[in-house]
Amino acid sequence: MQKNQKNCCGVWMDGHKAMIVKLGEGATNIGIIDSDMDEAYYHDGEKIIGSFSGRQHESPEKTISERKHNIEKKYMKQIFEEIKNNDEIYIIGPGEMRHRFEHFIEAEHKRDAHKIKANDSCDYLREVHIVDRIKKYFKIS
């Protein structure tokens, strides 16, 4: 990488984990962030009776949906904190989470939305292949 090149990073993500690949001067740093998405589902007994809150009875679907939304937002905040200082961001992944992450950045961090250079579909890959794909995108050998 030349000295005048920008700091680039790629994010491979799905609903369970994100792999962040930061490309700096002559170095590649890889980090993993796990989501807590599995915790978003039913607690014991909740699928039968729902949750009670004072005089209200909330359906378990509403409670689970809110819990899932909050966990997803926390997950996206963690990822963004790791990549916010990069000049260019490349997002890849197999499902809809990558689109929701891009929308999260556009809504919550408008000043940084221009850093997203691409958002591409990508199957589940081994770590080495994810790194290779991100390097290839940024034309780094």
Give short role names for the model-derived ranges.
Residues M1-S141:
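Terminal alpha-helical anchor/extension segments at protein ends
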